[in-house]
Amino acid sequence: MSLLRNRLQALPALCLCVLVLACIGACQPEAQEGTLSPPPKLKMSRWSLVRGRMKELLETVVNRTRDGWQWFWSPSTFRGFMQTYYDDHLRDLGPLTKAWFLESKDSLLKKTHSLCPRLVCGDKDQG
């Protein structure tokens, strides 16, 4: 059970890492053609063909992903997302926390007073 709990705790960190990697990939300039060419001897080997094909497929996926997420990384869209998140989740956090704290304090004082012996705390009616 603890293994499952650890996996669930690691999920937000993993999502953050993927988001950072996507941002880095989107911000990097396009690679110039012909910068990394294999030596002539390795050009026709099977592994170089597999590596070349995988590179083509991955570049296609990365470029499509970058193009698809480009709208999100524009300043106005990201600012709008953060403003909406703040409005939905964080705006009322201060007053809600203060109200919860005061309510919890009052409840705790009532419970403590009800458990307190009359000789130590005195009678409620005398107060």
Curated annotation (Swiss-Prot):
Superkingdom of origin organism: Eukaryota
One Pfam family cited in the UniProt record for this chain: APOC4
Keywords: Glycoprotein, Lipid transport, Secreted, Signal, Transport
GO molecular function annotations of the record: lipid transporter activity
Function: May participate in lipoprotein metabolism.
UniProt cross-references to PANTHER family, sorted A to Z: APOLIPOPROTEIN C-IV
Name recorded for this polypeptide: Apolipoprotein C-IV
Species the sequence originates in: Homo sapiens (Human)
